[in-house]
From Swiss-Prot:
HAMAP family: Azoreductase_type1. InterPro entries: Flavodoxin_fold, Flavoprotein-like_sf, FMN-dep_NADH:Q_OxRdtase_AzoR1, NADH:quinone_OxRdtase_FMN_depd. Homodimer. Its EC number is 1.6.5.-, 1.7.1.17. This is FMN-dependent NADH:quinone oxidoreductase. The keyword Flavoprotein applies. SUPFAM superfamilies: Flavoproteins. Signal peptide: none annotated. Its cofactor is FMN. It comes from the Bacteria. The lineage of its organism: Bacteria, Bacillati, Bacillota, Bacilli, Lactobacillales. It comes from Streptococcus suis (strain 98HAH33). Keywords: Flavoprotein, FMN, NAD, Oxidoreductase.
Amino acid sequence: MANLLIVKAHPLDAQKSYALRALEEFQTRYASLHPEDRIEIVDVFEDQIPALDKPLLEAMGAAKRGEAISPEQAEQLGRYNALTQQFLAADKIVVVNPLWNLNVPSQLVSWINTINVAGLTFKYGPEGSIGLVKGKKLLHIQSNGGVYAGQDPAAQYIKSIFEFLGFEDIHQVFIEGQSADPSQSQVIFEEAMAKIDQILESY
């Protein structure tokens, strides 16, 4: 039995988002192939994702020094650490997001901050940082109005972050071009799902 963690980073629903529509179909197909696997979902728009702000940074520093922190800081720090541990416990990760202004939603960045933890997911070496997260798989699904073929900053950001952490098994599927040619929207979606089906054969 494997643990699958889905990170949902879109505030709309599947009727209004090609990315979430693809996620729904992915979940159905994945569950039929791996009925024993455990699936957890983090919705970065609905769940509590602590922002890496001044109170949280101060709480992190105080905790390392063994100093007291406020109940509010303890709650935020506890949630932050829980998200890190949830990520580490997962065998497979699915990240689903739109491309907004050539970037990912800021809420997704906040979640990504929780998985970049020195000493847990990477360490500092004499020649640079070393990723500590090995043997996990990533599937990144992103919807784009235009066609970027993975060269947009958001896609590159996701890929580089997970490579930095040590991931080697990375797949990216882009549902893109619907705004450029709305008449081809269904064809574009079906082509993306065909790619996802192919990935599922070994995912």
